[in-house]
Amino acid sequence: MANARALDKRRKSIRNIRKITRTMELIATARYKKAMDRAAAATAYTEQITKIVSRLADAGLDVQHPLLEQREKINTTRVLVLASNRGLCGGYNASILRTALPRIKSLRESIPNVIVDASGKRGVNGLKFRGIETEQRFLQFEDQPAYDDVEKIAEGYLAEYITGKIDRLDVVYTKFISTSKQEAVIETLLPLGSLGDESDSASDGSDDTNAEYEFLPSAESILEEVVPTSFKVKLFKCFLDAAVSEQVARMIAMKGATESAGDMIKQLSMTYNRARQSQITGEIMEIIGGVEALEG
């Protein structure tokens, strides 16, 4: 039987760990709620941008924009991997890497130049461990990505695409579907595609398909602003989804750790009680034996 004092010491240690994991769970829950509110607001903004694009498409415009053009030959592509700066979030980062690695491998088999960028220390280190070096590393993002920071990254990608330095941009991130479901996905953000593709989701269920719109100063000038903004908003939404999913993963992981610690404490308490009972019984038997020896 294990020593009662050692069991009690271990039980106290696990209780302290449970306090830490419980605190981290509460912090992750609070951060999740804040991140969720920001993601919901960004979703509403994205929908409005999509509606504007839909109306431009409904206007029957014959317009061209560099971001809408499909390249006949892809020579250079960038892959942006969105991971976290911190751990203790379950399989969040492992899932991202499992999704990113096959895509990077397949792209390198068919495209001459594949450049990998990463957001988050865990992503950078995870890729490096697997022999993949990253060119750009974005380590400033935590649980609340700022639009200004993402906009700078987006403008860099836009400039590279327009000047022909890259022909494609893939983003690997965890898409937030619900509190119980988050999925690591890959989205091609550049090129954006056609106006018609942009308008598919916005036109569903709309009741103003027969309305006529007047664009001032012109539909073309609006398009020049809307198309780059559409890309920036989409990239920002990827960062927000990743942030929400990270907090959900951490919240679930810490909740599981807290519950496991509770189960271990119960088991150790039972073992401690048995050990203590055995120790007391032994001491009583020693006393009885001593008394009998004195009487004899």
Curated annotation (Swiss-Prot):
It comes from the Bacteria. GO terms for cellular component: plasma membrane; proton-transporting ATP synthase complex. It is found in: Cell inner membrane. InterPro entries: ATP_synth_F1_ATPase_gsu, ATP_synth_F1_gsu. Keywords: ATP synthesis, Cell inner membrane, Cell membrane, CF(1), Hydrogen ion transport, Ion transport, Membrane, Transport. One of its GO terms (molecular function) is ATP binding. Signal peptide: none annotated. It is a peripheral membrane protein. HAMAP family: ATP_synth_gamma_bact (MF_00815). Belongs to the ATPase gamma chain family. Produces ATP from ADP in the presence of a proton gradient across the membrane. The gamma chain is believed to be important in regulating ATPase activity and the flow of protons through the CF(0) complex. F-type ATPases have 2 components, CF(1) - the catalytic core - and CF(0) - the membrane proton channel. CF(1) has five subunits: alpha(3), beta(3), gamma(1), delta(1), epsilon(1). CF(0) has three main subunits: a, b and c. This is ATP synthase gamma chain. It comes from Rhodopirellula baltica (strain DSM 10527 / NCIMB 13988 / SH1). The lineage of its organism: Bacteria, Pseudomonadati, Planctomycetota, Planctomycetia, Pirellulales. The gene is atpG.
